[in-house]
Amino acid sequence: MQITDIRIRKVEKEGKMKAVVSITIDDEFVVHDIKVIEGEKGLFIAMPSRKANDGEYRDIAHPINSATRENIQNMILEKYKTEIENV
């Protein structure tokens, strides 16, 4: 699996959410609404989610293993930092 495109939309208002990201996988599949969040230990990503009837948020799409999640997160945050530096 290759991430072939990353699109970053910076969030202008103050808060913990810094950007909303779309990734394209293998030039064939797009995942929208991945969030870049500023946490206590630095930046991390949150996969797209929806609020269930019980009030809990559940991921709509997410990696199955931690290595894939880490790879996606590293690529997104690298691109985010590059775009922020170029502003």
Swiss-Prot record:
Xref: PANTHER family: SEPTATION PROTEIN SPOVG-RELATED
Protein family membership: Belongs to the SpoVG family.
Gene3D superfamilies (alphabetical): Stage V sporulation protein G (3.30.1120.40)
Domain of life of the native organism: Bacteria
Main function: Could be involved in septation.
Key words of the record: Cell cycle, Cell division, Septation
Protein name: Putative septation protein SpoVG
Organism: Agathobacter rectalis (strain ATCC 33656 / DSM 3377 / JCM 17463 / KCTC 5835 / VPI 0990)
Swiss-Prot/TrEMBL GO biological process terms: division septum assembly; sporulation resulting in formation of a cellular spore
InterPro entries: SpoVG, SpoVG_sf
